[in-house]
Regions:
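Signal-transmission coiled-coil "S-helix"-like helices
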Residues: 1-11
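Metal-dependent catalytic cores of enzymes that make or break cyclic nucleotides
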Residues: 9-11, 18, 25, 29-267
């Protein structure tokens, strides 16, 4: 009886270990839509290759053989070959283009302010070249630069999420967002296929762009498989956001408290 019970315990322990291994592999596959069940396919391919090596009667594998414990080791190793991806950030696993990276988009916004300052300087020198009073033009340029510097400092402070964003601050954000800058390059070139699908129709260049914008490509739709139906068997009652991500610049800068959108909070 003791022997039978011991065997049963060992078998149950192996089954539990196997379940943990496959759960880990399934979790890694679920981290990215691009792996396509990679962790589940590798064990099958590994067994086919190992079986072919064992069956070889000539060549370099003619003396190759695997015992019962060896097969178990191959099985476990194949299922765990990608376990390191558990600690790999999703933006690395899902990297779709060479320059894609997780970074603070305040750098993009700062560069747009730099463009506006440069445009103001060019306009100043063009006015002077056209006969305008140099002192007045320089004074107007200095005032314009000071305003742009102050507005960027305000946007940057909103980005930090340390203070509550009240309606007055949101109204000012919208006023700043209404500024425009001139884009002369196609923003559909070099982007990932997913981002390209989210973009709106191509526009004729050059085009005036809002300084801060909520664009179609900022809205990442939530797949039907990620929705929890109201009649789910677990009885969960969750408000599932319609979007997987909402990366709109104005939307995120207008977050009332903290740094997270509703979509971010749901994901956490």
């Amino acid at each position: 009886a003791v022997s039978v019970e011991t065997r049963a315990l060992i078998r149950a322990q192996k089954q539990l270990f196997e379940s943990f291994i496959q759960l880990l592999a399934d979790a890694i596959d679920a981290k990215s839509p691009y792996t396509g069940g990679h962790c589940a396919r590798v064990p099958e391919l590994t067994k086919l290759l190992a079986g072919a090596a064992c069956a070889a009667t000539d060549g370099p594998f003619r003396d190759f053989t695997l015992g019962e414990e060896d097969w178990e080791a191959v099985h476990i190793a194949a299922w765990l070959h990608d376990c390191g991806k558990v600690t790999t950030p999703e933006y690395i696993v899902d990297k779709a283009t060479k320059l894609e990276v997780l970074y603070d988009r305040i750098h993009e916004i700062r560069m747009r302010f730099e463009v506006l300052k440069r445009d103001a300087e060019i306009a100043c020198w063009q006015a002077i070249a056209g006969g305008a009073d140099e002192a007045a033009a320089r004074a107007a340029l200095a005032a314009g630069w000071a305003l742009l510097d102050e507005e960027f400092a305000f946007v940057a402070a909103c980005n930090e999420g340390g203070e509550e964003i009240d309606p007055a601050r949101i109204e000012r954000l919208q006023q700043i967002a209404a500024r425009t800058w001139l884009r002369t390059l196609d923003d559909r070139l070099g982007v990932s296929p997913d981002e390209l699908r989210r973009k709106g129709p191509a526009v004729a260049l050059p085009v005036l762009e809002a300084l801060l914008a909520d664009k179609p490509e900022h809205r990442v739709a939530r797949g039907a498989d990620e929705l929890i139906p109201a009649d789910n068997p677990w009885g969960f009652r969750l408000q599932v956001p319609a979007l997987l991500y909402n990366r709109g610049e104005l939307t995120n800068l207008s977050i009332g408290r903290g740094t997270l959108t509703d979509e971010d909070r749901y994901k956490i």
